[in-house]
């Protein structure tokens, strides 16, 4: 599974761990990705999306139909 939010496009970020002696080693910060199913009335079916908690809140505020319509215009596969 890709560690990427389908709505917001959040991806892992990269940086360094820095020890007390200032030694740098590579690391990555993964986003908090959740799988969530929604009923989309405009499509007439359920869709499973990989989302971050911010995207879940955005869908709760704006509505699943509007967000899915924007995803489809972007060319996102659902």
UniProtKB/Swiss-Prot annotation:
Top-level taxon of the source organism: Bacteria
Keyword check for Plastid: no
Single GO MF annotation: structural constituent of ribosome
Single GO biological process annotation from the record: translation
Region (Disordered): 1-28
One term under GO cellular component: ribosome
Keywords, alphabetical: Ribonucleoprotein, Ribosomal protein
Stored InterPro entries: Ribosomal_bL28, Ribosomal_bL28/bL31-like_sf, Ribosomal_bL28_bact-type, Ribosomal_bL28_sf
SUPFAM superfamilies per record: L28p-like (SSF143800)
A Pfam short name: Ribosomal_L28
UniProt family annotation: Belongs to the bacterial ribosomal protein bL28 family.
UniProt cross-references to NCBIfam families, sorted A to Z: L28
Protein name in UniProt: Large ribosomal subunit protein bL28
Organism name: Cutibacterium acnes (strain DSM 16379 / KPA171202) (Propionibacterium acnes)
């Amino acid at each position: 599974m890709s560690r990427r939010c389908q709505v917001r496009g959040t991806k892992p970020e990269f940086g360094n761990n820095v020890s007390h002696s200032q030694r740098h080693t590579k690391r990555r910060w993964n986003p908090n990705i959740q799988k969530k199913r929604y009923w989309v009335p405009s499509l007439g079916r359920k869709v499973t999306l990989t989302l971050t908690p911010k995207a879940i809140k955005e869908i709760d505020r704006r509505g699943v139909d509007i967000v899915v319509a924007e995803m489809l215009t972007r060319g996102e596969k659902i």
